Curated annotation (Swiss-Prot):
Mg(2+) 2 binds at residues 275, 277. Residues 108-308 form the ATP-grasp domain. This is D-alanine--D-alanine ligase. GO terms for biological process: cell wall organization; peptidoglycan biosynthetic process; regulation of cell shape. It is an enzyme of class 6 (ligase). GO terms for molecular function: ATP binding; D-alanine-D-alanine ligase activity; metal ion binding.
Length: 312
């Protein structure tokens, strides 16, 4: 374990649940985080902001929080700003990094300006002429394409579109979840990878091989036939290079401490970064625990390591 006296952490809230589309994932993550912290002797308690006012954190003597909320106000900077206001230390990125990290549109704009490779894309606004935009986008980017709401996580409402005819319906569905929709060229041929970032830990890349078309919500949290390859199959030099780019992709957004950066490789082995996750899932299907386990770090040790960053 970390060797840190559990009493140093004081009273810790595990923020879980919330009211986003990822509530169930957050509840599952939070329960495991709570148990992991308690296993280490830390005075940790569950706290669902959808059911209790945040002011109760201060009133009840909490001094720090492990943020296991996913999506919505738990990941877009709002909860971070509130915790800053109440003087409660918390895991993960601050207001700016959280807000940018959840916004795929602005993430890609920052990456384009800072030299981080990301797939070509177009944006569609809710209420646009979806049929007309679909024709224009298919002509520019070709197919297949990924359609995704700009600010949802866990692949909520993400659809892979293989024909221009299917694009208008996918745009309409994604626009129900966000006023900005990203339409991204599908990068094919080299596979999907994730880089897990946790302070100074050197965690291995994971190659993700879903049984279906792509790594969607079902593949992430329900299916048992998704393959997670560790080691990922890349040579050591390539893996080190992609981890370095992933860390920079994280840093240029103002993200800190821990999270995940997801990317695809094309047939030539070139990386294209898709998104970061500043409050990654911590369920039994989630990637950070898998990466940590591969280098001998157990679940409880990992969550204590993440929480220990709030002591700095």
């Amino acid at each position: 374990m970390s060797g840190i006296d559990p009493k140093r952490f004081g009273k810790v809230a595990v923020l879980l649940g919330g009211d986003s589309a990822e509530r169930e994932v957050s509840l599952n993550s939070g329960r495991l985080v709570l148990q992991g912290l308690r296993d280490a002797g830390i005075d940790a308690h569950p706290f669902d902001p959808a059911q209790r006012p945040l002011a109760a954190l201060k009133d009840e003597g909490f001094v720090r929080a492990f943020n296991a909320l996913h999506g919505g106000y738990g990941e877009n900077g709002q909860i971070q700003g509130a915790l800053d206001f109440y003087g409660i230390r918390y895991t993960g990125s601050g207001v700016l990094g959280s807000a940018l990290g959840l916004d795929k549109f602005r993430t890609k704009l920052v990456w384009q300006q800072t030299g981080i490779p990301t797939p070509p894309f177009e944006t569609v606004m809710r209420g646009d002429d979806y049929a007309a935009r679909a024709q224009d986008i298919a002509a520019k980017l070709g197919v297949p394409l990924f359609v995704k709401p700009a600010s949802e996580g866990s692949s909520v409402a993400v659809e892979k579109v293989k024909s221009a005819d299917a694009l208008p319906a996918a745009l309409e569905e994604a626009a129900k979840h966000d006023k900005i929709v990203i339409v991204e060229k599908s990068i094919e041929g080299g596979g999907e990878y994730t880089a897990c970032i946790a302070a100074d830990l050197d965690l291995p890349l994971i190659r993700i091989v879903p049984a279906g078309e792509f790594y969607d919500y079902h593949a992430k949290y329900i299916a048992n036939d998704t393959q997670y390859l560790i080691p990922c199959g890349l040579d050591a030099a390539k893996e080190a290079e992609f981890k370095r780019i992933a860390r920079r992709a994280f840093d240029v957004l103002g993200c800190t401490d821990w999270g995940r950066a997801d990317f695809m490789l094309d047939a030539a082995g070139n990386p294209y970064f898709l998104e970061v996750n500043t409050a990654p899932g911590m369920t039994d299907h989630s990637l950070p625990p898998k990466a940590a386990r591969a280098v001998g770090i157990g679940y409880s040790e990992l969550v204590v390591k993440v929480l220990s960053l709030t002591l700095d």
